[in-house]
């Protein structure tokens, strides 16, 4: 990596290892506009918004694709460059669906933001765009090609982070579009509904499917009893929209808000995560006893499960048969509320608040539909719940604290960290290790399972067996690891896979935020774990009692599922 000094707008700026001039400029405190630049993705250099002028040669080039050189002198805001950027914005707006007030991305749209920043009030160019059909076939996301500015962010995140390549460029010149191969609907592809394309989309071209209307109809229907479960990652992200720092746990305020909105009962998905930990640990120990099959994969991430079904079905025998915490809660609610519904003539309507768009797909899976109704009637993302609170005028910071309802509102610290990368694997290790001391907990926390590294490896000894563990962020990295396992280069007993970077805290349904926000959310979950009344799933008295009451056969019926090749 290069080291040196360059002049940026007359200011001396030292650089040491920055991969491009854009990074050096931002280091100098200048926020260069971009559409197509994400530091975690390859450099594309298509939008040309980040162009700079070399004061020595007069040459204009994209700073994202320029390597910094010692002695460079560049200008970022000359009259020539400002005119250049305004023209780009005008051209984009001329071929853009500008129904901004009704757009799902309004207020979070990069094109809208930069048009305001650069004072673009008039568009001098004619509207020559074609009108394309909106693709609403996916259970998780909606694709509107009429709002696409061809920045390529969705193409690269799908290929580089997830290794899926569902979206790509098609045609040439003025006919250029982003679409699935052969212009298929998303539902006709092998899309896993992770929603990361929507998370990086700079406009409203790809958005998470909005189901707020369905939620309000249920809440206002007197014949329905609306019960809600809240996932761990939601509590450390929802506050960001109301002035709380990323990572602050606002669960008790969110419970109050939901009750004010008309929800009857509010529970915590950590209750289901404790069920998952115990069931998955028992399954893992049984595999150790019987010699496999290994590796055993975690099954909490529905996008990961979908990927194996579509792309690597030979590994379906390796995936845990445990349902995700959301679906375990769904099955338990279906069982527990049946008699109550019959007695009072109401129908229990179950909503799950999740950080994840793939949960919308999971809730609609036939394995989780019984007697014509899904175990989870509706999945709302964190952003959808934020929108609902803002619609009602609720100010989260002004609310009193109210804990989730019992008995389904009690969860362990191990369950809370399900929301961050490595959390599921750590929860299983906590349960399986015979040593239950505080010192053992500290040792587990430094095994190497935590953090956002693409692939993390750790080992722990149980009895006479040294267990090999791995934690994977992103499907592209999972593919790499599977290839090494296939080739005999790697062996593991347990592998946790989360499709989203950083785990559920980085889910596509979370508030739009920087990478640092995701890291702080993960830190917030670990702080909540530290403060938890009990740290292990088997210490949850409600879960232990219910499992004893159900018995082994009924537990297996409610908590386990099998998957098949698609």
Q: In which residue ranges do the predicted regions lie?
A:
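Iron-sulfur-associated redox domains of electron-transfer enzymes in respiratory
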Residues: 5, 12, 16-83, 209-566
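A short, structure-level motif marking secondary-structure boundaries and short turns
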Residues: 5-8, 97, 130, 139-141, ...
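A generic secondary-structure micro-motif detector
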Residues: 10-12, 101, 134, 187, ...
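Fe-S ferredoxin-like electron-transfer domains
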Residues: 48-193, 199, 206-221, 225
């Amino acid at each position: 990596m290069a080291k040196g000094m360059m002049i940026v707008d007359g200011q001396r700026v030292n650089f040491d290892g920055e991969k491009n001039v854009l990074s050096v400029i931002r280091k100098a405190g200048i926020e260069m506009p971009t559409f197509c630049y994400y530091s975690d993705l390859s450099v594309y250099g298509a939008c040309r918004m980040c162009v700079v002028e070399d004061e020595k040669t007069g040459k204009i080039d994209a700073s994202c694709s320029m390597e910094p050189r010692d002695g460079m002198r560049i200008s970022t805001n000359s009259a020539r460059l400002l005119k250049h950027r305004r023209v780009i914005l005008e051209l984009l707006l001329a071929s853009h669906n500008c129904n901004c007030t009704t757009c799902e991305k309004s207020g979070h749209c990069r094109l809208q933001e930069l048009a305001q920043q650069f004072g673009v009030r008039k568009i001098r160019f004619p509207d020559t765009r074609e009108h394309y059909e909106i693709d609403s076939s996916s259970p998780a996301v909606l694709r509107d090609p009429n709002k696409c500015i061809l920045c390529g962010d969705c193409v690269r995140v799908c290929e580089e982070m997830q290794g899926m390549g569902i979206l790509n460029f098609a045609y040439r010149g003025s006919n250029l579009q982003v679409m699935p191969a052969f212009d298929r609907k998303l539902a006709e592809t092998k899309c896993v509904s992770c929603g990361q394309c929507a998370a990086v989309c700079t406009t409203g071209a790809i958005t998470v499917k909005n189901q707020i209307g369905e939620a309000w109809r249920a809440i206002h229907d007197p014949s329905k009893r609306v019960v809600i479960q809240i996932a761990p990652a939601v509590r450390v992200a929802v506050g960001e929209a109301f002035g709380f720092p990323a990572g602050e746990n606002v669960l008790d305020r969110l419970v109050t808000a939901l009750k004010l909105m008309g929800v009857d009962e509010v529970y915590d998905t950590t209750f289901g995560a404790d069920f998952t930990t115990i069931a998955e640990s028992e399954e893992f120990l049984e595999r150790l006893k019987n010699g496999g099959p290994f590796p055993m994969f975690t099954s909490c991430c529905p996008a990961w499960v979908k990927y194996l079904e579509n792309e690597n079905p030979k590994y379906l025998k390796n995936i845990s048969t445990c349902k995700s915490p959301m679906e375990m809660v769904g099955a338990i609610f279906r069982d527990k509320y049946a008699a109550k519904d019959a007695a009072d003539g109401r129908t229990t309507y179950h909503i799950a608040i999740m950080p994840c768009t793939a949960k919308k797909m999971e809730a609609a899976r036939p394995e989780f539909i019984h007697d014509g109704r899904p175990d989870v009637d509706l999945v709302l993302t964190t952003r959808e719940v934020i929108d609902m609170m803002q619609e009602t005028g609720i100010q989260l910071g002004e609310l009193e604290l109210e804990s989730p309802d019992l008995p389904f509102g009690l969860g362990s610290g191990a369950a809370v960290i399900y929301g961050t990368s490595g959390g599921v694997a750590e929860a299983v290790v906590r349960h399986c290790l015979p040593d239950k001391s505080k010192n053992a907990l500290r040792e587990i926390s430094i095994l190497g399972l935590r953090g956002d590294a693409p692939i993390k490896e750790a080992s722990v000894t149980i009895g006479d067996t040294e267990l090999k563990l791995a934690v994977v962020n992103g499907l592209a990295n999972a593919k790499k690891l599977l290839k090494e396992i296939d080739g005999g280069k790697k062996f593991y007993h347990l592998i946790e896979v989360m499709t989203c970077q950083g785990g559920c805290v980085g889910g596509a349904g979370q508030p739009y935020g920087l990478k640092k926000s995701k890291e702080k959310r993960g830190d917030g979950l670990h702080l909540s774990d530290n403060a938890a009344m009990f740290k292990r799933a088997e210490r949850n008295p409600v879960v232990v009692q219910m499992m004893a009451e159900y018995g082994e056969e009924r537990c297996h019926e409610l908590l386990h599922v099998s998957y098949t090749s698609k």
